[in-house]
A protein has these predicted regions:
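Short, charged, low-complexity amphipathic alpha-helix
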Residues: 1-28, 136-138, 152
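Compositionally biased, low-structure terminal segments
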Residues: 6, 27, 43, 48-51, ...
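Short, Lys/Arg-enriched phosphate-binding patches
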Residues: 20-98
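Amphipathic alpha-helical oligomerization/scaffolding segments
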Residues: 75-160
């Protein structure tokens, strides 16, 4: 008789085998890492946190793991659209900044451009779209302009 705990341990063993076998396949690894994180399977191996599990078990940093998980989520969201999908994590990364609907819409628009499927082309396309949405000056630009004006006023008050 198999208990729930046994099934959970078997599932963890399977997920870790996926990570080991497909270390270069961002989709499979991201999917496995997401399930390990969400189901807290790492506790079964006596790890207190997902981050310590990543570091000690896979020599993987938190940010890299989360990029893989985010890329998996993008591919999972885009997969109903068609067969042409981002081929690696770097190509999927710019789309992670968008909500699910915007990801699908922008991906369709990108494919219509006929541009080569590269991380740089996708990043430029998404950045251009985000630039249209964010027409307000950035906080840094506003502070910079205010600072420059204040410095000019102070310099004008100094007489040599």
């Amino acid at each position: 008789m198999t208990t729930e705990f046994d099934r959970s341990e078997q599932r963890l063993a399977h997920l870790e085998a996926v990570i080991k076998k497909y270390r270069q396949d961002f989709y499979s690894v991201g999917k496995a890492l997401k399930e390990i994180r969400d189901a807290r399977h790492y506790h079964k191996l006596s790890f207190k946190s997902f981050e310590s599990y990543l570091r000690l078990r896979w020599d993987m940093g938190r940010s890299h793991a989360y990029r893989l998980i985010d890329a998996f989520c993008v591919i999972d969201n885009l997969s109903p659209i068609g067969e042409l999908l981002p081929k690696n994590e770097a190509q999927a990364r710019p789309l992670t900044k968008l909500d699910a609907f915007s990801q699908r819409r922008l991906w369709r628009e990108f494919l219509k451009t006929g541009k080569a499927l590269s991380a740089l082309n996708i990043k430029k396309f998404v950045s251009a779209h985000l630039g249209e949405q964010n027409t307000k000056a950035s906080f840094i630009e506003v502070i910079s302009n205010d600072y420059q004006q204040a410095v000019r006023e102070m310099l004008s008050q100094i007489s040599l």
